[in-house]
């Protein structure tokens, strides 16, 4: 009898598929949060595999802050149409029409109103009792200590000091009416794992991940790509073409690029082999206050 062994990526894939199926079986109305990034793209592929050849039994939902890169929105719409996903797009239009943005109100207020509050409103609107997210434990310290099945109270708040025990692959999906669970099937993946899986599965991703000459301006130590005409006048004469790519994607004024020559998946994987910094070091919102990400998650952020 031959030995049956799984590779490292196959083990991660099997664990994630098990988690996704568990949620579909345990919850009445789950949703998969779709940020359009590399992790979301992997999570979507895993969901498709989990229920193939059938249709995935829950929708995708994107919280659009109205400040995403243009290429992200184009990719989102074409991907959902090509693969037949039920895509929900929600935004805080009241705050948007009031002129809320990262340049005028700062990253903290912008993130709270355009992302956190928009998310909480959408979860209540559709009465979702479970929401998949693409966060990984290697990204950031508050995410490192969060459970795979992360309990939220009726206000969608997370209490890191009151988390449920999670032994092996046994998950507690019980909630009372109004409570919910955030589920992170990629918790045990690393950034390198993500890229190797993208290469293995030939998963389509936003072109911003690949190095290219792009118009950038340095703001507070970050290389910010000038993606549209909302860049303040004071920075416009500082724009320079730089060979850059993005390790993580978000609102363009709050997401720093990294100088890189990696214009293929293979080169990105090679780059990941030697990097010593988390991709979150280029996200402005992670540093706008002490323990920034943990505080945002307590308030209901992704």
Curated annotation (Swiss-Prot):
Assembly: Heterodimer composed of CysD, the smaller subunit, and CysN.
Species classification: Bacteria, Pseudomonadati, Bacteroidota, Bacteroidia, Bacteroidales
Reactions mediated catalytically: sulfate + ATP + H(+) = adenosine 5'-phosphosulfate + diphosphate
A Pfam short name: PAPS_reduct
Keyword Nucleotidyltransferase: yes
GO biological process terms on file: hydrogen sulfide biosynthetic process; sulfate assimilation
EC number(s) from the headed UniProt entry: 2.7.7.4
Gene name, Swiss-Prot/TrEMBL: cysD
Function: With CysN forms the ATP sulfurylase (ATPS) that catalyzes the adenylation of sulfate producing adenosine 5'-phosphosulfate (APS) and diphosphate, the first enzymatic step in sulfur assimilation pathway. APS synthesis involves the formation of a high-energy phosphoric-sulfuric acid anhydride bond driven by GTP hydrolysis by CysN coupled to ATP hydrolysis by CysD.
Record has ATP-binding as a keyword: yes
Similarity field: Belongs to the PAPS reductase family. CysD subfamily.
Family matches, as CDD domains: Sulfate_adenylyltransferase_2 (cd23946)
Any GO MF annotation of the entry: sulfate adenylyltransferase (ATP) activity
Protein name, UniProt field: Sulfate adenylyltransferase subunit 2
Keywords assigned: ATP-binding, Nucleotide-binding, Nucleotidyltransferase, Transferase
Enzyme class: transferase
The protein's annotated pathway: Sulfur metabolism; hydrogen sulfide biosynthesis; sulfite from sulfate: step 1/3
């Amino acid at each position: 009898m031959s030995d049956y062994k799984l590779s490292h990526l196959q083990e991660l894939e099997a664990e994630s598929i098990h988690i996704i199926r568990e949620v579909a079986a345990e919850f009445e109305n789950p949703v998969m949060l779709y940020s359009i990034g590399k992790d979301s793209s992997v999570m979507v592929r895993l969901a498709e595999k989990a229920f193939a050849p059938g249709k995935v039994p829950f929708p995708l939902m994107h919280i659009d802050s109205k400040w995403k890169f243009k290429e992200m929105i184009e990719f989102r719409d074409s991907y959902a149409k090509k693969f037949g996903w039920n895509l929900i797009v929600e935004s805080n239009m009241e705050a948007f029409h009031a002129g809320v943005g990262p340049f005028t109100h700062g990253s903290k207020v912008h993130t709270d109103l355009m992302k956190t509050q928009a998310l909480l409103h959408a979860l209540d609107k559709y009465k979702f009792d479970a929401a998949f997210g693409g966060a990984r434990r290697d990204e950031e310290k508050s995410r490192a200590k969060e459970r795979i099945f992360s309990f939220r109270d009726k206000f969608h708040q997370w209490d890191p000091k009151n988390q449920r025990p999670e032994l092996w692959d046994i998950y507690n999906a019980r909630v009372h009416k109004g409570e919910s669970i955030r589920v992170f099937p990629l918790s045990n993946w690393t950034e390198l794992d993500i890229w190797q899986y993208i290469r293995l599965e030939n998963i389509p991703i936003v072109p911003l991940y690949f190095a290219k000459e792009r118009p950038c301006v340095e703001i507070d130590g970050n290389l910010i790509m000038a993606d549209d005409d909302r860049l303040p006048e004071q920075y416009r004469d500082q724009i320079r073409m730089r060979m850059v790519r993005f390790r993580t994607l978000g609102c363009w004024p709050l997401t720093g690029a990294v100088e890189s020559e990696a214009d293929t998946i293979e080169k990105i994987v090679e780059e990941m082999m030697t990097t010593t910094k988390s991709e979150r070091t280029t996200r402005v919102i992670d540093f706008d206050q002490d323990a920034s990400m943990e505080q945002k998650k307590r308030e209901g952020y992704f």
